[in-house]
Amino acid sequence: MAVIKCKPTSPGRRHVVKVVNSDLHKGKPFAGLLAKKSKSGGRNNTGRITSRHIGGGHKQHYRLIDFKRNKDGIPAKVERLEYDPNRTANIALVLYADGERRYIIAAKGMKAGDSIQSGIDAEIKSGNAMPLRNIPVGSVVHAVEMKPGKGAQIARSAGAYVQVIARDGAYATLRLRSGEMRKVPVDCRATLGEVGNAEHMLRQLGKAGAKRWRGVRPTVRGVAMNPVDHPHGGGEGRTSGGRHPVSPWGQPTKGYKTRSNKRTDKYIVRRRNKK
């Protein structure tokens, strides 16, 4: 995988930094694992904008990813690695011995021809999935379930991982990248190793149009609006907003905590690190 800084042949190329992976499949994705993906433009069923800064972008198909990894005892072979426009991680097309194909999140170091397996009898190696009760303490894992059988929810993006730091009775304690320590049932499955494509964080799009290709619309500052549109709007000339930063609906922003307490808080052993 190479990180390439483009030559400044035009203003739009001057700041572009690309991550090129020559191992990725250059053809079309496997048609049997594609689903329709329609764009909402950030609107709900009444046509009102409920999520700002969304709209346009290239048409995409959703890739059906196997987050459960529940095909136990059947060895599989990695056919190829592919780009997935729906996530930062790359995905791997795997062929099971019984002829079924599935997409999974590509682990770090995974390549075409590798053998993987799921279940309690699987070998302790990167790419294999098994319950947390069978994973040695201290191991680095990704694609971790929060409820047994629900499918992976933790550590699915490029370069992500969590560490199994303890196992006591019915729960395993995980250390997340954020610094949070959390208990998860030992029957939840996880995949050994880190998620691949860690160089994704080095990428620079270089121009506004590259954001538009991805369906992201501009973000307008509140101080540049009129008073009818934002609490920071209006004033003669340039202003600082005149108050502590708030959202368009008057809720404090920049550090204001909005998370409500949940019954699952009891599983959080230590809160994430403060930035």
From Swiss-Prot:
Domain of life: Bacteria
Keyword field: Ribonucleoprotein, Ribosomal protein, RNA-binding, rRNA-binding
Name of one Pfam family that matches: Ribosomal_L2
Endpoints of the signal sequence: none
One GO location term (cellular component): large ribosomal subunit
Region Disordered, residue ranges: 223-275
GO biological process, one term: cytoplasmic translation
One GO MF term attached to the UniProt entry: transferase activity
Known partners and oligomeric status: Part of the 50S ribosomal subunit. Forms a bridge to the 30S subunit in the 70S ribosome.
Protein name according to UniProt: Large ribosomal subunit protein uL2
